[in-house]
């Protein structure tokens, strides 16, 4: 019971910290690119959370972090879209990385998962500007390059911090990172089970051959 409680407390604490970090990163002065727009930093923090945590905590980090940012900013129109878009982004990226893709060559598969998450964000904000903000198709198309650059910058920053600076490795070795985010995925288990089956069949065939020789 004590181990389970400590694990739950650690997971909740890390999730709350990352959620707050996403919210605070939204208030950091953005990078101004006059022809395109502003590049915010919150996407990099969201992708980093996806690398470190399981799908459900990642959903909370991405969705609630941006939701609280819009709430404090007074942008009530975007609160729900931010929750859905960034929550889905974080959940899908984490799910692909920890549950679908094999653990070998993780940085490469992390990049692939981030591309899917970036597509979700770009499509989500494209539809939001048309359907929720009523800005029209032209405005949505004009803002799309800004979203693409922002997602690219977020992916690059998250990959650099997590794998380039070996943050995930350091947290895992120190025991601070909750185990649910680094457990083996189903592909590895299937590979191990298939290897065991092959070994068993090889042993059986060799036994049959030996029996035949003895006869």
Task: Show where each model-derived region lies.
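Loop-helix junctions at membrane interfaces
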Residues: 1-215
């Amino acid at each position: 019971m004590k181990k389970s409680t400590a694990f739950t407390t650690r997971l909740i604490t890390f999730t709350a910290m990352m959620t707050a970090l996403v919210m605070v990163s939204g208030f950091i002065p953005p990078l101004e690119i006059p022809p395109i727009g502003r590049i915010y930093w919150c996407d990099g923090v969201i992708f980093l959370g996806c690398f470190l945590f399981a799908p459900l905590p990642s959903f909370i980090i991405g969705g609630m972090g941006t939701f609280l940012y819009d709430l404090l900013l007074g942008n009530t129109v975007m609160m729900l879209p931010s929750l859905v878009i960034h929550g889905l982004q974080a959940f899908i990226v984490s799910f692909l990385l920890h549950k679908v893709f094999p653990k070998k060559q993780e940085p490469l598969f992390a990049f692939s998962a981030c591309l899917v998450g970036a597509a979700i964000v770009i499509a989500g904000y494209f539809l939001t500007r048309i359907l929720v903000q009523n800005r029209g198709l032209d405005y949505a198309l004009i803002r799309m390059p800004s979203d693409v650059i922002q997602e690219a910058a977020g992916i690059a920053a998250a990959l650099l911090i997590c794998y380039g600076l070996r943050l995930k490795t350091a947290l895992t070795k120190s025991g601070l990172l909750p185990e649910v985010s680094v457990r083996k995925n189903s592909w590895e288990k299937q590979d191990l089970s298939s290897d065991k089956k092959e070994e068993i069949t090889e042993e059986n065939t060799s036994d049959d051959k030996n029996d035949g020789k003895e006869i």
